[in-house]
Amino acid sequence: MALLQISEPGDSPAPHQRKLAVGIDLGTTNSLVAAVRSSVPEVLADAQGQVLLPSAVRYLDGGAVRIGREALLEQARDPLNTIVSVKRFMGRSAADALASGAPYEFVDAPGMVRLRTVQGDLSPVEVSAQILAVLRQRAEDVLGDDLVGAVITVPAYFDDAQRQATRDAARLAGLNVLRLLNEPTAAAIAYGLDQAAEGIYAVYDLGGGTFDISILRLTQGVFEVIATGGDTALGGDDFDSAIVAHACAGEDVAALPVADRRALLVAARAAREALTDQAQAPFEVTLRDGRAIQATLTRAQFEQLAEPLVGRTLESARRALRDAGLAVGDVRGVVMVGGATRMPVVRQQVGALFGTEPLTNLDPDQVVALGAALQANLLAGNRPPGEDWLLLDVIPLSLGLETMGGLVERIIPRNSTIPVARAQEFTTFKDGQTAMSVHVVQGERDLVSDCRSLARFELRGIPPMVAGAARIRVTFQVDADGLLSVTAREQSTGVEAAVAVKPSYGLSDDEIARMLADSVTQADSDARARMLREQQVEARQLVESVGAALAADGDLLDPAERATVDQRLQAAAQAQSLDDVEAVRAAVQALSDATEEFAARRMDRSIRAALAGRKLDELA
């Protein structure tokens, strides 16, 4: 007997009706769009049959814009107005962009760098939107209808500012963002669904301008990212730069005109790609001054040039394994993603590290877009019966806030799966305190000064109470796109303040790696520093409370007792600035001992005052 699926009136979908959603791989070098058609994900081609859209935009006088291959044709002749690898500048400052050495004229602007062109100063968001608009139009032309939304992939290490910039670019392009998805996770979706793989896998993603390594646990219906690492400034472009430096030995490449430098990089990329299948490749460029630079690059020479760059990726892989508490032998397989993984030297060294042949049966240029298409199809509500899986990503660095003494209270630890929400209660430090400053930080160290500041805001309207009586609940929430919001709420009145964290510029992977390394090498000194700060805060609190008590009830002490308390109060006040934790602790203990009897007398006085004039039956 057949089973019928019964829906509520009005909720039953029309036969064959599907919502059109796409997956977009917005890459540094190339971008793609894919969709699920007849239950199979496929990359969509343009009218010429090309699936890869070069991530290049050229701006011309008069307002015309060329995108993709048309833009690349004039790249060497018009480098300042032909923007490539714009993904590197998403959510970055002018200082970051200048440090990249890219051949553009950068303009510092609030929030994000801008690039100077003949059509004015443009942000990376606006440039990326041009690329996304072409992909949206291609998808609508091929699929024959409007899109309900798109899943757009980003490097796993993109921070809040870079992710927000990507969302902004999509909106400018007329796209509804269903979700931002980490590129390695998208690859895991593609391989996991196609092969029903289970176990621990590494996703090695080396694209044109970024590198990501993710360690994933694939089990029945669940994809969980358990550790991530990478470098947002390492990719195929850097291998090209190494070839240029080799071929132009003795030449001051940085002093050459922009057009010459661009031509050299184009020739280097052609040589690198040729060496994938050939033993040697020519490198020939004629500079604008008429000089010819000619060389023949062998695969052995290229492997020698590439070794330090590949070595950096392997060190990131080892670090990610350590973060996950795994050994190399625990990894069942390695998924290769990104066009740069076609280089034989990359596949050989990755295979040697993990002791297994890397998985390359899906096109490394397309695998991310295919996985994004599967996720988009799911989010659009087109999931077929039985296809029910869960996806979990992680945050790369712990999130917390500053407490008294400049200490960090971690709210969400690093490698927590997202989306995630955590809350913790805090209280006031001083009597009558009506406002609280909330300082949100990111990092693994114990002191605020050693962590990265993300945002500050104030909660006002706290009812005046004695210190420690107010209850302020602080909630940290990280959504599925890795964006953070923080809310502080006073429990008795409901007064609330919040902030959405969008840093003015991104945090590089080198900085993340340094922060993680420092948290290990400085663990002992951090523990000592935290202990000292905690004692200093305790001393400050005790000094202030004893001072207030003396002002209110000092008459409860005789002259000798008062002299002892005053002496120890002064000693504790001076101890706050000491760097000796034992000395601070001793001063606090001495003051506590000296005021113990005083505290008891104050309690007695308070009780007598409360009971004065009351009858016994009123207390029953």
Curated annotation (Swiss-Prot):
One Pfam family recorded for the sequence: HSP70
This protein's UniProt keywords: ATP-binding, Chaperone, Nucleotide-binding
GO terms for MF: ATP binding; ATP hydrolysis activity; ATP-dependent protein folding chaperone; unfolded protein binding
Top-level taxon of the source organism: Bacteria
Any GO BP: iron-sulfur cluster assembly
Record-stated family: Belongs to the heat shock protein 70 family.
Purpose: Chaperone involved in the maturation of iron-sulfur cluster-containing proteins. Has a low intrinsic ATPase activity which is markedly stimulated by HscB.
Protein name from the UniProt record: Chaperone protein HscA homolog
